[in-house]
């Protein structure tokens, strides 16, 4: 008789109620003979406390129904740890015998407190632990303390809120955790006896006593937990294998005792251990020598238990339910792989289906340990470079629920579930592990990540770059960069004026990579041809757009892109300015055309009125003549016939002459208006050229520039332009560059030129204007050029603006400003400093004095610096915007300055609106008196 039969005979229906579970679990095997302790050996000692235990169970069950909501409890110790045999025999992966100490003891696992939501089963476990502690105390002491009972009862009633992350005591961990499992122990042993699973027989004494749990027998425990409250011991540590429905078309429905169809069973399969996910193979791996353990949770949600099953289109009574396991090939599900189960002697046997019961509105948990695949998958060996074999084969672990009937030996399939793809290997798992360099790669769901940098197609890593790719990148999406203002600081707007100049300096070229570079980078002939920029040239224009990564220079194309954006913005502003100017000109032309149309209409109406008066006059004459002839006699009509014809012909000639005269006058007026319009247009576009005569023929590029002969023209009078050093308040003031005799000074206080005749006041002497007796010009209200450019003479406190323009010599539309600066005879023959202020985005270029072909420079005849200086005027840059002009040594001299976005504007022939030209012409007033 087997050990299971002995246990079944001992635990009959009469003795099941006297079963002492705590004594059976805590008492060790006899060290001398190795015999098994009977679970009912001390059943008599339990009779005295049975009434108290039943009362406690009723109280706890009542509290269970009140606390049906899910409560978090500290994660319990795993039922079967990875390296410890929970059955008290041997380790699952160690070669030591069953006498060896465990890898780690439950007594040393007190700090384990991971959160796990077990649904309503949590309250059952807490209550079961407390009840088991009381029973253990009764067994050892023989009585139960009533104050402790009342204290526990009060604690259970006051438990209204969930408790999170509470630390369990050592006694609570070491005690059994399921009271309902104790109450159904007889069904467990009977199911184990039917399945042929013998109880363990301890052949040798142990080194020390430890907890005995008969795990070789499938554990069946009904639970009140819902379908979503299944505990997964490996959930927080590693990825768990999943099971899905399998061969659903072969399932058979269940019926109750009234032949009413029942709802489908809620089945949840959990692999407690034995399957590890391998990121390199992208699937789960099982070692053939290591067993795996499966827990199946079956819940029936109907009020009636299943009694019949549909078999061959008729209802057949169900004898019992079985749970079986098998493996199938992933590529051919019809090919089954046998599943074996190891027993206490570590010898594998063919797995026998496990019997279990299905109760109404209850959940049944079946735990089947020590399962093995009888075969390994094919093509497990690596091909090259430790990469997975492309011809790798896989298994599927199938869990089947059968209903045993009398008409079929194999039973009827109720439900079946298959796992994900599994690789079963028999060799050392370390041979399939990646190299040390690949340890940093991890998989989180469907994402593969690493903490370090990644290089694709190259062994070199660019400094501070997380990803380095040697080759092309194909992307169907977008590159998204975080640009939230909450992430940024020190935000400043860049000037867009220089962007156009920067883009004009860039050179876009077509090029090919060198053959040796193409060989290293793996580029074909088509990929060698590129269009882009040269890093060295870009570095000279935009230094922040080029980075040095060590061997070569790289270009930040994003920086170049934003430079083009700024240039586009500047072009839009310039286009807007041009549009506004064009609109102004169009409006002016429209106004003139309207005036011309009104004048033409007025002239036409006048001509039509004149023609109408002549016709009415002739008509009236004719009518009077006809009336007179009718009133006279017939003889007088023949006499006056000739006179009437002469009068009619005379009136017709008069009207024709009048019309011709008026038409001629209108034509002359039109010609005159056209000539005036053309002259006005010419005057507006070409300024003051009608006043000047050039010594040399002007070219196309010099049409609007100053090309004059001072001998033939000088401004006769500039009433709005202050003369430099116009007044002198010292009778002994010396004159320069003027050969004529100084005028006689009657008033000893002042010597003034023609400016005093216009009502200019003579300013009194002050410490600020008595330097050498020469007064500085007052700072009158000036008229700016409206371009942002300001020209000043700091030593004289004079600003050169539009007051110094002659007629239309300053043309803002063409960007040319010819400024005539009169200088008095009291100005010394020394150099003069001027200051030109331009906007931040523009640069002032010193183009020097006018060449002799464009301007006739006249040197002072009595200049003290004539022998040492050149007869050609000079313009020297002293500081950024301060220049020194040698105008004091000349009677007349001209200098050119250009303000633009580039420093090369002096070499440009045509401005095209890219710069503004300022021509400063200095002339002494003594030339007027001498001429």
From Swiss-Prot:
Widely expressed in many tissues, including neuronal, muscle and epidermal stem cells. In neurons, expressed in dorsal D (DD) GABAergic motor neurons. This is Myelin regulatory factor homolog 1. Its EC number is 3.4.-.-. Residues 53-68, 127-138 have a biased composition (Low complexity). Residues 1-658 are cytoplasmic. Myelin regulatory factor: The peptidase S74 domain, also named Intramolecular Chaperone Auto-processed (ICA) domain or Intramolecular Chaperone Domain (ICD), has protease activity and mediates autocatalytic processing of the protein to generate the Myelin regulatory factor, N-terminal active transcription factor and the Myelin regulatory factor, C-terminal components. GO terms for cellular component: apical plasma membrane; basal part of cell; cytoplasm; endoplasmic reticulum; endoplasmic reticulum membrane; nucleus; transcription regulator complex. Keywords: Activator, Autocatalytic cleavage, Cell membrane, Cytoplasm, Differentiation, DNA-binding, Endoplasmic reticulum, Glycoprotein, Hydrolase, Membrane, Nucleus, Protease, Transcription, Transcription regulation, Transmembrane, Transmembrane helix. Glycans are attached at residues 797, 912. The chain crosses the membrane at residues 659-679. PANTHER family: MYELIN REGULATORY FACTOR HOMOLOG 1 (PTHR13029:SF18), PTHR13029. The record marks 482-483 as: Cleavage. It comes from Caenorhabditis elegans. Changing residue 274 to R: In ju1121; defective dorsal D (DD) GABAergic motor neurons rewiring. Impairs the function of myrf-2 by obstructing its function in the complex formed between myrf-1 and myrf-2. One of its GO terms (biological process) is regulation of synapse assembly. Belongs to the MRF family. Residues 37-52, 117-126 have a biased composition (Polar residues). Residues 169-436 bind DNA. One of its GO terms (molecular function) is peptidase activity. Disruption phenotype: Worms show normal dorsal D (DD) GABAergic motor neurons rewiring but show larval lethality. Worms lacking both myrf-1 and myrf-2 display defective DD neurons rewiring. Homotrimer. Interacts with myrf-2. Interacts (via C-terminus) with pan-1 (via LRR regions); the interaction promotes the role of myrf-1 in the synaptic remodeling of DD GABAergic motor neurons at the cell membrane.
